[in-house]
């Protein structure tokens, strides 16, 4: 199947015989919005072929075009949402704003992106595309306001005002070691 299992499941739960006869509780608009925002958050470009595909934060997946395995370098967890750490992943207002997670329109407003370093292969960063400042909190507790941050295990980011906390959870292939600035 091309679509992620959680999208298939909400369709089954919503349109099954049990759901249609009322023996199963109906899925709410909020349930659908949560699934569609997750779907949008996991839509990425394959690092192998460049085509759009769905990337999970909890497991490696195959690109729906080239069939090569894609494993994100980690997860960016923001509230109840989890985004794959992969170049090109977009952050939306529904992720980074306190007013953002109740309206479906806010899943269309870009606020940031995971980008590759211009100078160091394999190093990724979070780029702030808003006019406001985001705060980086390094694993050693050092805090800094800025527009871009190098992704590393244990990195925390406060998005916007009031701050929405986010943090990086690493997977086994997240680059570690020497800290290289994101240019």
Where are these regions (language model features)?
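Short cysteine-rich clusters marking metal-coordination/redox-active sites
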Residues: 46-49, 61-66
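Short metal-coordination and nucleic-acid-contact micro-motifs, chiefly zinc-binding Cys/His arrays
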Residues: 39-43, 56-62
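Short Cys/His-rich micro-motifs in 6-15 aa windows
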Residues: 66-75
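C-terminal boundary/linker segments immediately following FHA domains
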Residues: 135-183
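Disulfide-bonded cysteine-rich modules in secreted/extracellular proteins
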Residues: 42-52, 76-80
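Asparagine-centered strand-capping/turn motif at beta-strand->loop junctions
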Residues: 126-130
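C-terminal lobe helix-coil module of Hanks-type protein kinase domains
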Residues: 1-30, 34-35
């Amino acid at each position: 199947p091309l679509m992620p299992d959680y999208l298939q499941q909400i369709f089954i739960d919503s349109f099954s015989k049990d759901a249609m006869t009322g023996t199963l509780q109906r899925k709410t608009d909020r349930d659908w919005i949560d699934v569609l925002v997750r779907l949008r958050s996991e839509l990425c470009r394959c690092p192998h072929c460049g085509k759009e595909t769905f990337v999970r934060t909890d497991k490696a997946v195959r690109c729906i075009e080239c069939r090569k395995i894609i494993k994100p370098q980690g997860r960016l967890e923001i509230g109840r949402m989890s985004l794959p750490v992969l170049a090109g992943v977009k952050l939306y207002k529904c992720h980074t704003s306190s007013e953002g997670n109740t309206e479906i329109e806010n899943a269309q407003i870009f606020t940031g992106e995971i980008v590759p370093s211009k100078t160091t292969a394999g190093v990724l960063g979070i780029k702030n595309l808003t006019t406001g400042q985001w705060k980086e909190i390094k694993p050693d507790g050092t805090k800094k306001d800025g527009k871009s941050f190098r992704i590393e295990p244990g990195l925390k980011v406060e998005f916007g005002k009031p701050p929405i906390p986010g943090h990086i959870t690493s997977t086994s292939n997240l680059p570690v070691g020497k800290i290289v600035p994101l240019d």
